[in-house]
Amino acid sequence: MRNHGFILKGDGWHLSPLYDVNPVPEGDELSLCVNEDDATISLDLALEIAPYCEISTKDATAMAADVLKTVRENWNRLAAECGLSRSAQEYMRPAFSLALE
């Protein structure tokens, strides 16, 4: 198993919602397949396999909308707070294209 992490909360260990994820401006494929044969970066594919992760399509759609909104509203500010120059932010912008559509 790769790219998994856990968070200890008051009621025990929980799967981290995100771990070892790095934006890649020119990326169009994941390191690992999402299903048995597709490594495409695709929201539709993620929603398609949600039931296999015991997440309803309705809940997965709501989660995706929440993540996209959070990224859209915060990535530039957080990048600046971390010291990324304006030109570096522009270089990285394509990595966030799904959230910016």
Q: What are the residue ranges of the model-derived segments?
A:
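Anionic ligand-binding catalytic core segments
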Residues: 1-101
